[in-house]
């Protein structure tokens, strides 16, 4: 194989020496190959060969380190093939295994292990399991809080009063834990915590205009004001050349000048901007403006209306800026910040105290966590001089002398701690740091990555040869086709800039085509071509003629709607993507299958499912739905979701089994295990056991069942006379024997050994392997086994501690995600997050969910925090019950918002640049007409997308669509929604766009040729007269009548409501209907019209009222306001929705509790609400029994029974007897009360009979409470 042909820039990177070199390597530019070649040339140089162990190579992942080590090993091997006697090369192969090609954490661990004595660390330390550390954190925070409560610490109590939610301090604990994790990404976390608090410790001379908060706010306001200026320019252009609108234009011009003055003031200082904002006023547009004649041309009216609309929106936006950030003078701000000092100082104190407690707990257990790894290494490698500056320690100097050069891969993802660490071991006299990365691909800010580190060097280093601090840019893309490169450049030239994106996407940064795809002889069959955009709307209004101006509604509510993205909307887009994939895979018009280029064969082959990847910004909610929909369309799919492990049935079962082995006195896990395939108890078995006694826990009743030999006269009155079946008794005995065996084994086996013993002894591991998805299920069980092995390495031991360990793990950290069983060569469409795709490439990339709004949940936190700006707390005066975002919080929100948008832009860049041959973009929007109108605003007059529009973007489509709608290729999208096509940009990128109507993809219709009626099939059957020796026998069998035919129609269980229907209407057709299994097909939400979606049925209304009556706190129903408050609480906790709450009348509920029956219920000691009941009932007890069976056959059914099920609304004990209450929400008037009673009487009578049987107490009274007339009817 020939040697690579390096570009000029790549050769400069490979050959430059003795400098700090920053390599800005764009996506697909071959940075890894260049980095490896540089190392190879260093160690194989004839003039000055370097030993491989003299190089420190820091990679981002272990996989990258392994790949690099392997590549270097291969290169050394090839060099030895050419020169087998070379001792230096032979030595390099030996040194390679102990070379420092590693991750930053591995390097830090080596430093710690070699110098543990410098930080008084036990040499036998181990790295704590992530979940074990999470548990220790929780224990530490709880203990710190308990101590502070006992000490009555005033600052702490003030903090809790300010930010604790009603009924607990969990939110405050989360604040402390969040700030601790954030602070640990600082080289000096204690200093950061103290400085962040002390920034609020100001005096009377404080000048807000000189603060970092003011500068942060102004950075955002500048963008906003400049955007408003551009809007006013657009408005002026609409009217300035129309004579009839001269006065109107003059007024617009005055306002434009005022806003331009504000823009200039923002560039000067906060005070200047504040003055201009305060003096800003808008013109009266009625006074002094000529009325337009009715006969005036329509274009004049349209121009005026368009200009006025732009102006009104500008006015509203400016007023919003003033009210949010320019509504306080310096004195007010000073008092606000001084007040907040009493909040933020305790925050830092509590975080520091938590850090100390957590550290003590880790030391007690002899463990360190990942934060410790970096900070302990930092403590070893640095000292602090007399001026407080960080300087390298003597140990760091030793490393400086050891390493000839330090290589840092993916430098754009370094954090501040890593920067200080590697700077400490780098040479200063002869610069020797090689840093390679791409700031446009920095997407780990949520892990405290600091792209600013890369940008600082990018802006300060020069590209001159011989410079000690040099940068070289690699922007030739060797991955993607021209169409992909052009599309990426077109989008990012328009949207990425220094303010949002943190780098200007200029000619230097744009991708340059470098890939070579050998052209196939049949170009029509090659996959590729124009970049595609597919949009689908959610509300099916594509054909509306009128485009309503709903920008404000969309901007205000879209975020809220996206937070609870409806399943149906995700399904819609998934189905659309499925259709796109099928189009890619099908034979084209010329009978050809589309092909992709395969480097392995240096040629083209048919596209396969494995060539396609679907990239999502976040996978948790979307990926499972996409996977299900695609598989339903016969598209093999794998979604790497990363959650759901603890929800799998096999893991739930084994964890329940472990729980009851430790403690069988737990009903829920016990019943879960009993009805699992391990023991095979049926619902009837469980009922047989439960009805033996209502008072005992299930395990005690189970033991009694196993010992059953007939109850004696000594049975207590609460025990049932139901006799368990022999099979049930035997199952119970077998269970207890095995449980005892398991308990004994667990006493002397390690946890992991015991779990594997359970797998094999019960046969459960083999059982799940035979189920659908068996290999995945077995892999999940293996993960639990591996988790148990890790647990055994901790100081905790035993089943009890392991169960607690898992429970705390579920509460304290994210779900682990199911085990991965997919091979890299499996022929499936992959669904993955954009983050996981980084560093990968695929022939076809489908970027989906581009219409999903950016996550802004962090802004809802009580306290924001930032490395440079410190704290941004919510202002809370709990005594005066005042709460609002402080000016500091507004500053942090502005800064973090820009940083987050920059991160999102880089995420989008990573997604697009994964594509080798075909890029497809998909998204959904609530109304395509409204959205396209909004996206196309101003495209005819602006050369580029304004930073203001980028700042206001809510999702990726808000950035992509304003760019592409300027392009000639997508004129069809504008025309399809009734807008004029405007072409403002000449660009060689190619685009294809399609608007999908959801009705087009709901059902895949068969073609007419595929349809064949049943009648046509029957006509083909040759029906001859029967002529067979077996005719008589066959006829006899076919005419046989089963004597127990009624039993075949009898259900296993029947509800009281169904019996009520039978008894009220005993026509056989109704009876047969009730005794048949019913399947209710509810119309999916996404094909319901708006009226159907909004409608709440009478049944649903009743269900909601019953739910509220079930969960109400009966100690707090003494007033209508009490009940209203509780209902609001149910909404906030997610028990009911706002819409559901709106149909509950709290006054009606209050009247119930104020009634005689309500007061009696409140006074009762024992109250049961929404109680599920089950009972075996003889069919003869159902009055209509006589109508069902012929008289001659009645004796066949003497013992025929059915399991009766129902839910009793409420019953309570009074004078050792039962009072039964049933709520009814039916529409009732005074005239039909008796009809209602007759309608429900039989139902209550059945409930009463069952309750008497189950409780052993008589029902003295049965009451129906009619909410319609606020009246109870008792008998």
From Swiss-Prot:
Matches recorded under HAMAP family: AddA
Family according to the record: Belongs to the helicase family. AddA subfamily.
Residue ranges occupied by any UvrD-like helicase C-terminal domain in the UniProt entry: 531-839
Subunit structure: Heterodimer of AddA and AddB/RexB.
Keyword list, A-Z: ATP-binding, DNA damage, DNA repair, DNA-binding, Exonuclease, Helicase, Hydrolase, Isomerase, Nuclease, Nucleotide-binding
Top-level taxon in the UniProt lineage: Bacteria
Protein name as it appears in the record: ATP-dependent helicase/nuclease subunit A
PROSITE patterns, alphabetized: UVRD_HELICASE_ATP_BIND, UVRD_HELICASE_CTER
Record GO biological process: double-strand break repair via homologous recombination
Domain UvrD-like helicase ATP-binding, chain residue ranges per copy: 4-481
PANTHER family associated with the record: ATP-DEPENDENT HELICASE_NUCLEASE SUBUNIT A, UVRD / RECB / PCRA DNA HELICASE FAMILY MEMBER
E.C. number(s) listed in UniProt: 3.1.-.-, 5.6.2.4
GO molecular function: 3'-5' DNA helicase activity; 3'-5' exonuclease activity; ATP binding; ATP hydrolysis activity; double-stranded DNA binding
InterPro entries on file: AddA, DNA_helicase_UvrD-like_C, DNA_helicase_UvrD/REP, P-loop_NTPase, PDDEXK-like_dom_sf, PDDEXK_AddAB-type, Restrct_endonuc-II-like, UvrD-like_ATP-bd
SUPFAM superfamilies: P-loop containing nucleoside triphosphate hydrolases (SSF52540), Restriction endonuclease-like (SSF52980)
Intrachain S-S bonds: none
Keyword Signal among UniProt keywords: no
Catalytic activity: Couples ATP hydrolysis with the unwinding of duplex DNA by translocating in the 3'-5' direction; ATP + H2O = ADP + phosphate + H(+)
Binding positions for ATP per the UniProt entry: 25-32
One GO CC term, this protein: cytosol
Required cofactor(s): Mg(2+)
Function, as annotated: The heterodimer acts as both an ATP-dependent DNA helicase and an ATP-dependent, dual-direction single-stranded exonuclease. Recognizes the chi site generating a DNA molecule suitable for the initiation of homologous recombination. The AddA nuclease domain is required for chi fragment generation; this subunit has the helicase and 3' -> 5' nuclease activities.
